[in-house]
Each structure stands twice: as structure tokens, then as C-alpha cells.
Curated annotation (Swiss-Prot):
Pathway: Amino-acid degradation; L-arginine degradation via AST pathway; L-glutamate and succinate from L-arginine: step 4/5. The lineage of its organism: Bacteria, Pseudomonadati, Pseudomonadota, Gammaproteobacteria, Enterobacterales. HAMAP family: Aldedh_AstD. Its EC number is 1.2.1.71. It catalyses: N-succinyl-L-glutamate 5-semialdehyde + NAD(+) + H2O = N-succinyl-L-glutamate + NADH + 2 H(+). It comes from Escherichia coli O127:H6 (strain E2348/69 / EPEC). Belongs to the aldehyde dehydrogenase family. AstD subfamily. InterPro entries: Ald_DH/histidinol_DH, Ald_DH_C, Ald_DH_CS_CYS, Ald_DH_CS_GLU, Ald_DH_N, Aldehyde_DH_dom, SuccinylGlu_semiald_DH_AstD. One of its GO terms (molecular function) is aldehyde dehydrogenase [NAD(P)+] activity. It comes from the Bacteria. PANTHER family: ALDEHYDE DEHYDROGENASE-RELATED (PTHR11699). This is N-succinylglutamate 5-semialdehyde dehydrogenase.
Length: 492
């Protein structure tokens, strides 16, 4: 039984799904998808649970959420292993994900009060008040790269605000989704407040098509995000928050410490085997001997990055991709770029057939036209050389996406120019593109999102504002508007 609906574990009535470790092929989890009828049951359960959950005080909801944080802490080792085995990530990185989940609780509580709390302004004849109210029933679609942390970034603020939820994990990480749901169960959420439905496209389409849904919170690919946007078009009453990845540029200008710049670039492009939505996909490198030296060093160090299994000792920097198919898609993308005229500096290699262990790839595309503006979700970095900083910014902005952008330079003036001209929601200076703070908004523009950033701003899309003018008594104004006569004289 792998679905959690209205406080009960039930067996899915859809197709059988089997999840294997992407490197070893070991069977980790199996269960049946939720069919459309079960998705409807989950929605009805969430709708029935909503009034009572929303009427609880914020403090009562906070107690349940903080209990979940405590359970994350006490089950950290077990959840770390589940995420690592299911995604192929190294143990160290999965541990940082669980830590981020724990930290998200306190941050979300603070963000609720700052972004969507209550305010009151006294007026001569009363007061003006601002409150926030939950939407109702929200669907949360989780991604596979951070199957605990990223859904958590929607679920926690949504529950704190008083919403009830139907959570569909990625079909590639059902085990992690179930493990997190079992911790929420132990936290004592009332039946129907949080429901889990497993499945792929059919389950997702059934969920997003529900009429009795007040909103949908999504993290994933641009293609799926666009499909959801089209599906919910003409329904302005439903909140839709989309985070859809990017084709992110990193500009390497002047470099004082080549190794430090190489380290930043590797952290930006290859951490999580390139499976972060903020990863650098395009590297813009200043022409000249310094740029040549940097590029040679980048290739040399990247060549030493050998992916390993989740429990390898010593621990590897990167593990496997989410699947062999995902790894092969990166290799295919590299081959297509090479066929267009790209110059391979480091070829990505599948270490062993039947696994997802893929070494990083670097290919120079300077002078090549018609390069697709697509996100290659893996460890493949494309390089362009530029002559002046204005050209670098133009090239960086030449994308339909707009999630992250970064600059390596000692010159504050150039960063200030980038801040003015960059088309991205995250713009970093001498910091990896993959570095983000939960105390700041996280999201992009263009094909990277629909202006509903998460993290610190997640509270904004989890509640709507209610403004009130209030007075505890009603009296006739001392001064009336022209044309109003409340005298006792009878007009004849």
C-alpha cells in the first residue's frame, strides 16, 4: 500500500511501477499508480479536511509542522540513505538535502509572519487591517533531483497557511515521496490534510484536471510547466506556481585565482551530476591567454571527476544521474552539438552500460550558429569566448529562460552592470550559480517560471490577502458629503 488518502494507506489501482537504483539496478520500491478515481478521492478528502484545518490557530498548525521537523532530525540517517539510493546521489549530498528540509521549517514559519502575517493601522474612526487566508486544496508536483527538499518547500508553507494538499512525487522518486509522507503521518496531521498519490503522466494529468482544485505548485521541466499552464488557462481563480529550470549562463571575466574560479565553475556546472535547475549550462569566457589557462585547468580538473555509487568510500563528488536514459540523453545532446561544429574539450562517457554513471563533458561552441536554447539536465557545459563585457551580457541574455546567472570578476562595476541588464531571477557574483539561500526568493522569469518564486516568497502563493476597514461602533459622520441631508425638516 503506497498511497496515503484520507488518513489511510491504500493500494493504487493503476499500473504497477518498479523503482530501481539507477546505478546497480537493485529494486528499491514497487507499487501501483493512483488511478483517476483515487485522485478524485484524495481531492475530496482534502476538501473535507480544509475547513477544520484552516480554522486552527497558526500556533496549532505550527506545532504539527515542528513535530515533522523533529522527525526529520531523528530519522535523518534513514531518509538520507533512501534519497541517495533512489536518486543515485552520493550520501554526503543527500544528507545536505535532509538538513535543508529541517532548516526549511523555521524559515517558513518566519516567512509566513513577514510575508503574509497580520497588520493593523489605526485610523481616526476605526482601523485598517490586513490578513491572509489559505486558498483551499492545492496540488504539489515534486521533482526527482531533490525529492525531499523541493516538495517540502511547497508543502510546509502551504500547510502553515492553512491549505490542504494532494502531493504527487516524481514517478522517478516514489520511495522518497512515501518515506517523507510516513514522517508526516507520524507528525499527527489530521486525515485528509496531506494526501499522497503516486504515478506518472496519467496520474499528473488527472490531478491537474480536477475542477475542485484551488491551485497547483510545480517544480520540474519547462515542457511540463508549459503543459500545466495551458491546461489551467482560462481558470484565473486557481493559483499556479511554476519553477521550470534554466539554460543558465556563467561569465568568467578577469580571474585572479584560477583554481578558485575552476572550483566555482565545477560547483556551478557539475554538482548533483548537473541535475540542479540552477546549474551553469553555458560558460562565457573572456578571450586571451588568461582565459586559455583557465579553460585548460577546468578541463584538467573536470577530467578527474569520477562518479561513484551512493555509498562509495571515499565519497565521490558526483554520483549517477536519475536513470541510464537521462545519462544517454546527455551523451546524445553532446553528439548533436559536436555534429553542429562544436569542439569537444572533454567528452562525457558512460562508465558502464546499464548504469547512469556519467563523466562530465565540456564542449566549445564559439562561432557555431543555431545552437538549441534548451536545458540539458546533466553534466554538460558549453563554452563560448567573448571579447568585451557588453558582448558577454548580450550572449548571456540570449535565452528564453531566466533562472540564474553569475559573474566571476574582481570589479564591482561590472557586477552592477550585470544586475541592471541580466534577465534572471538569481544573479550571483563570485559565488556558484547553484548557491541559493532559503531566506531569499528562488525563481526566474521567461521560460523559467511564472513570477511565483519559492523559498522565502513561497508564503506569497500559499495565501491570499484580505483587507478590512473596521470600527467597533457605527456613528453618523460629523461632516456629510454634499447633497446628503439628514435633518429633521420635511422637504415639500
Amino acid at each position: 500500500m503506497t498511497l496515503w488518502i484520507n488518513g489511510d494507506w491504500v493500494t493504487g489501482q493503476g499500473a504497477l511501477r518498479v523503482k530501481r537504483n539507477p546505478v546497480s539496478g537493485e529494486v528499491l520500491w514497487q507499487g501501483n499508480d493512483a488511478d483517476a478515481a483515487q485522485v478524485g478521492q484524495a481531492c475530496r478528502a482534502a476538501r473535507a479536511a480544509f475547513p477544520r484545518w484552516a480554522r486552527l490557530s497558526f500556533g496549532d498548525r505550527q506545532v504539527r509542522v515542528e513535530c515533522f521537523a523533529g522527525l526529520l532530525e531523528s530519522n535523518k540517517a534513514e531518509l538520507t540513505a533512501i534519497i541517495a539510493r533512489e536518486t543515485g546521489k552520493p550520501r554526503w549530498e543527500s544528507a545536505t538535502e535532509v538538513t535543508a528540509m529541517i532548516n526549511k521549517i523555521a524559515i517558513s514559519i518566519k516567512a509566513y509572519h513577514v510575508r503574509t502575517g497580520e497588520q493593523r493601522s489605526e485610523m481616526p474612526d476605526g482601523a485598517a487591517s490586513l490578513r491572509h487566508r489559505p486558498h483551499g486544496v492545492l496540488a504539489v508536483f515534486g521533482p526527482y533531483n531533490f525529492p525531499g527538499h523541493l516538495p517540502n518547500g511547497h508543502i510546509v508553507p502551504a500547510l502553515l497557511a492553512g491549505n490542504t494538499i494532494i502531493f504527487k512525487p516524481s514517478e522517478l522518486t516514489p520511495w522518497s515521496g512515501e518515506a517523507v509522507m510516513r514522517l508526516w503521518q507520524q507528525a499527527g496531521l489530521p486525515p485528509g490534510v496531506l494526501n499522497l498519490v503516486q504515478g506518472g503522466r496519467e496520474t499528473g494529468q488527472a490531478l491537474s484536471a480536477l475542477e475542485d482544485l484551488d491551485g497547483l505548485l510545480f517544480t520540474g521541466s519547462a515542457n511540463t510547466g508549459y503543459q500545466l499552464h495551458r491546461q489551467l488557462s482560462g481558470q484565473p481563480e486557481k493559483i499556479l506556481a511554476l519553477e521550470m529550470g534554466g539554460n543558465n549562463p556563467l561569465i568568467i571575466d578577469e580571474v585572479a585565482d584560477i583554481d578558485a574560479a575552476v572550483h566555482l565553475t565545477i560547483q556551478s556546472a557539475f554538482v548533483t551530476a548537473g541535475q540542479r535547475c540552477t546549474c551553469a549550462r553555458r560558460l562565457f569566457l573572456k578571450s586571451g591567454t588568461q582565459g586559455d589557462a583557465f579553460l585548460a585547468r577546468l578541463v584538467a580538473v573536470s577530467q578527474r571527476l569520477t562518479p561513484g555509487t551512493w555509498d562509495d568510500e571515499p565519497q565521490p563528488f558526483i554520483g549517477g544521474l536519475i536513470s541510464e536514459q537521462a545519462a544517454q540523453q546527455v551523451v546524445t545532446a553532446w553528439q548533436e552539438l559536436e555534429a553542429m561544429g562544436g569542439r569537444t574539450l572533454l567528452a562525457p562517457r558512460l562508465l558502464q552500460a546499464g548504469t547512469s554513471l556519467l563523466t562530465p563533458g565540456i564542449i566549445e561552441m564559439t562561432g557555431v550558429t543555431g545552437v538549441p536554447d534548451e536545458e540539458v539536465f546533466g553534466p554538460l557545459l558549453r563554452v563560448w569566448r567573448y571579447d568585451n563585457f557588453d558582448e558577454a551580457i548580450r550572449m548571456a541574455n540570449n535565452t528564453r529562460f531566466g533562472l540564474s546567472c553569475g559573474l566571476v570578476s574582481p570589479e564591482r562595476e561590472k557586477f552592477d552592470q550585470l544586475l541592471l541588464e541580466a534577465r534572471a531571477g538569481i544573479v550571483n557574483w563570485n559565488k556558484p550559480l547553484t548557491g541559493a539561500a532559503s531566506t531569499a526568493p528562488f525563481g526566474g522569469i521567461g521560460a523559467s517560471g511564472n513570477h511565483r518564486p519559492s523559498a522565502w516568497y513561497a508564503a506569497d502563493y500559499c495565501a491570499w490577502p484580505m483587507a478590512s476597514l473596521e470600527s467597533d461602533s457605527l456613528t453618523l459622520p460629523a461632516t456629510l458629503n454634499p447633497g446628503l441631508d439628514f435633518s429633521d425638516e420635511v422637504v415639500r
